[in-house]
């Protein structure tokens, strides 16, 4: 359970190696009834983890439980309850819109073709891929192709969605609409539906994110409900005179000729006594970047 809340999906001792990279997750908990964001820099292991959870990869060690059951995703009834979108190669390039609709209906009992058509129309997906002379989906832009992927998965009757970078190819308006779609999906489930999505677009997706898992180098380095994380961390701002003294207390610090700002643990607020500083509630983006900076192997290059 997560903070006394039932889990939609759990994992234990999940391990997978690629050369020098190692995915190593002793425990994974995705709370039921919420939207959980998976955040981390490129190569952190987000896609690998999602592929394991979705049953795309089976060459891993450890155990995954779906809906409190010790079950494989291929077991009867489990696959039908899970919707998945990958970052690429979701459809064969020569498929038309009609073929996407037909094949989704053959693969999944809970696929609703009428709902699919309505979503496609609402999202203004290029209608030229439908009909007897429909074009191949490969003709769609990256944004429209992701819309089609989302229409397919949201047209199914599922209990959890596993979405790998669904916001990346989308424009700002469509990202906002995706957030609305996730909210509606959760609301229809009356607390029994869940969404687990990876994203680099933290600011755009923050409004729909209830719970957050931060990954770096194959490990979970922080997690929690967003409201709790915003109480755990604090944004500190101050004048340049206090920069060096404050830097010692900050997890990360950005300074210029006017002053500084950075993230600190809220429990350390009293250590800033005597400094001319202001405290603010940080955004999820600010918290995430601070934690990633703490754990990354990247270093700032010299820019001449």
Predicted regions and their residues:
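Conserved ABC transporter NBD signature motif
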Residues: 62-78
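A short, flexible loop at the N-terminus of ABC-type nucleotide-binding domains that lies
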Residues: 1-27, 32-34
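The feature captures the beta-strand-to-loop junction immediately N-terminal to the Walker
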Residues: 39-41
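ABC-family P-loop ATPase nucleotide-binding domains
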Residues: 86-148
């Amino acid at each position: 359970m997560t903070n006394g809340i039932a889990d939609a999906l759990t994992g234990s001792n999940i391990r997978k190696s690629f050369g020098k990279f190692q995915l190593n997750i002793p425990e994974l908990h995705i709370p039921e009834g919420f939207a959980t964001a998976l955040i981390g820099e490129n190569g952190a292991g987000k896609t690998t983890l999602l592929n394991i959870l979705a049953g795309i990869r089976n060459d891993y060690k450890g155990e995954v439980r779906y809906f409190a059951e010790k079950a494989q995703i291929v077991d009867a009834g489990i696959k039908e309850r899970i919707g998945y979108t990958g970052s690429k190669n979701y459809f064969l390039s020569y498929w038309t819109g009609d073929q996407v609709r037909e094949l989704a209906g053959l693969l999944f009992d809970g696929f609703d073709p009428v709902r699919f058509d309505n979503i496609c129309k609402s999202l203004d997906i290029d209608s030229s891929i439908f009909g007897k002379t429909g074009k191949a989906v490969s003709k769609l832009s990256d944004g429209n192709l992701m819309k089609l992927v989302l229409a397919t998965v949201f047209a199914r009757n599922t209990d959890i969605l596993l979405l790998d970078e669904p916001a990346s190819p989308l424009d700002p308006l469509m990202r906002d609409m995706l957030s609305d779609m996730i909210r509606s999906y959760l609301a229809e489930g009356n607390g029994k539906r869940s969404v687990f999505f990876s994203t680099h677009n933290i600011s755009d997706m923050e409004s729909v994110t209830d719970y957050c898992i931060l990954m770096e180098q194959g490990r979970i380095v922080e997690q929690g409900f967003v409201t709790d994380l915003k109480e755990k961390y604090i944004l500190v701002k101050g004048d340049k005179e206090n920069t060096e003294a404050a830097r010692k207390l900050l997890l990360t610090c950005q300074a210029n000729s006017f002053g500084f700002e950075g993230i600190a643990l809220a429990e350390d607020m009293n250590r800033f006594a005597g400094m001319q500083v202001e405290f603010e509630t940080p955004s999820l983006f600010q918290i995430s970047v601070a934690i990633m900076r703490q754990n990354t192997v990247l270093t700032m290059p010299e820019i001449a």
